[in-house]
C-alpha cells in the first residue's frame, strides 16, 4: 500500500530554522518553544492534499547504480530487499507492504519495529557477504534490490529469473539517485520527489542558519575503534560538510574506514571527535584515553556520538540528513539549536515512517 504524501511537517521545520537565521537567539528557550509549536502538530493537522501521481508506464527500462540497464516488465507487486539502505528507503516510499523478503537481522532494526514491524518476521535473503540466492528466488519477487557489492552475484540471480536493481548511495547525490531509481521502479515517483525535496529543504535551511560561521575541524571515528576514520570518499564526509565542519582526515585516500595512529590524530588535532552511530565504544572511553589527552577535542570535552536510538544516521539512508542537523547543533550551537534537531526528527519520522521518536540520541 502506497502511503499518503505529506510534507507540511518538514516544511514547517525548515521554515522555523530559516526564520531563526544565524543568531544566538535560536538556542533560547523561547525560540525553541516557538520552533516546537511550528512542527509538532499532529499528522491530522499537518495533512495536505496528496501530490498528483506521476504515472509510470511499463515495461520500464531504468539504469541502476552499477550502470546496468534493467527492464521491469510490469509494475512490481512483490519486492525483496537485501540491503538495509534500500529497505529503509522502500518504507519511506510507502511500499513496505509489498516486501516479501528482507536483509538478515531485520528483527534487530529499531526503525523497522517502530515503522513496519511486520518486516521483522519476513524471510531473510542474507547479507552482502552471504546472499541467499535460492532463498530469494523461492520467494518469487517481482523485483529484487541489492547493494552494489553484490554485483558479481547479479548474473546468477538473473539466471534464476530475478529482475535485479543495484544501489550504491555513497554520497548525497547518489542517495538522491537511489531515491529516484526506486521511486520510478515502484511507481512512487511523486512520493520520491517529496522525499528528496524534504531532505533538500532541511539541508538548505541548515546551511543558511550556519552561514559563514567558522568551520571547526572534525575527526569522524569509526564503528570498531577511535583509530578508524572516514576520509573524503565516504558518506560521513558529506555529513561533516553539511554541518559546517572540515574533515580532519581530508587527506586520507582510503575509500572505506582508514586505520590511523594516535600520532596522526594528535597531528591533525581536531576541534571535535565524533563517534559513529554504531560505535562499539563510548564517549567516556575516548575522553579518558591517555593517548589522546593532548588532543584539543578531548581537552575541550568536544567528543560526541552520532544518534543511534532509531537508526545509524551516518549511513546513506533517507534520514541521514538528521545526522547533519545533529552535527550542526554540536558544531554551531549558537546557530542551530538542539531543539531544531528534535523537531526535524519528529517531522521526518512522523511523515515518512509513521511514528514520533521517543528518543533522539
List the predicted regions and their residue ranges:
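N-terminal low-complexity, Pro/Thr/Ser-rich intrinsically disordered segments
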Residues: 35-68, 72-73
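Hydrophobic core
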Residues: 15-19
Amino acid at each position: 500500500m502506497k502511503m499518503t504524501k505529506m510534507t507540511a511537517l518538514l516544511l514547517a521545520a525548515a521554515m522555523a530554522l530559516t526564520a531563526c537565521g544565524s543568531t544566538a537567539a535560536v538556542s533560547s528557550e523561547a525560540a525553541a518553544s516557538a520552533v516546537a509549536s511550528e512542527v509538532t502538530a499532529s499528522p491530522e493537522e499537518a495533512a495536505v492534499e496528496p501530490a498528483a501521481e506521476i504515472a509510470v508506464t511499463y515495461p520500464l527500462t531504468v539504469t541502476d547504480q552499477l550502470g546496468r540497464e534493467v527492464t521491469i516488465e510490469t509494475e512490481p507487486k512483490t519486492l525483496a530487499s537485501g540491503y538495509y539502505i534500500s529497505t529503509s528507503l522502500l518504507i519511506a516510499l510507502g511500499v513496505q507492504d509489498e516486501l516479501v523478503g528482507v536483509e538478515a537481522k531485520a528483527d534487530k532494526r529499531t526503525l523497522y519495529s517502530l515503522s513496519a514491524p511486520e518486516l521483522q518476521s519476513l524471510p531473510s535473503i542474507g547479507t552482502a557477504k552471504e546472499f541467499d540466492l535460492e532463498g530469494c528466488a523461492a520467494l518469487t519477487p517481482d523485483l529484487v534490490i541489492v547493494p552494489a557489492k553484490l554485483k558479481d552475484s547479479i548474473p546468477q540471480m538473473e539466471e534464476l529469473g530475478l529482475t535485479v536493481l543495484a544501489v550504491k548511495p555513497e554520497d548525497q547525490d547518489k542517495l538522491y539517485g537511489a531515491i529516484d531509481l526506486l521511486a520510478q521502479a515502484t511507481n512512487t515517483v511523486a512520493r520520491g520527489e517529496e522525499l528528496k525535496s524534504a531532505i533538500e529543504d532541511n539541508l538548505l535551511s541548515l546551511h543558511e542558519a550556519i552561514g559563514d560561521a567558522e568551520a571547526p575541524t572534525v575527526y569522524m571515528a569509526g564503528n570498531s575503534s577511535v583509530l578508524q576514520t572516514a576520509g573524503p570518499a565516504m558518506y560521513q564526509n558529506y555529513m561533516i560538510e553539511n554541518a559546517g565542519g572540515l574533515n580532519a582526515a581530508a587527506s586520507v585516500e582510503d575509500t572505506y574506514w582508514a586505520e590511523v595512529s594516535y600520532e596522526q590524530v594528535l597531528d591533525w588535532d581536531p576541534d571535535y571527535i565524533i563517534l559513529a552511530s554504531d560505535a562499539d565504544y563510548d564517549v567516556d572511553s575516548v575522553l579518558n584515553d591517555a593517548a589522546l589527552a593532548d588532543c584539543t577535542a578531548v581537552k575541550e570535552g568536544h567528543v560526541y556520538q552520532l544518534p543511534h536510538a532509531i537508526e545509524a544516521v551516518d549511513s546513506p539512508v533517507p534520514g541521514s540528513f538528521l545526522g547533519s542537523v545533529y552535527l550542526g547543533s554540536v558544531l554551531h550551537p549558537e546557530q542551530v539549536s538542539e531543539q531544531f534537531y528534535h523537531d526535524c526528527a519528529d517531522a521526518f519520522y512522523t511523515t515518512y515512517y509513521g511514528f514520533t521518536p521517543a528518543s533522539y540520541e
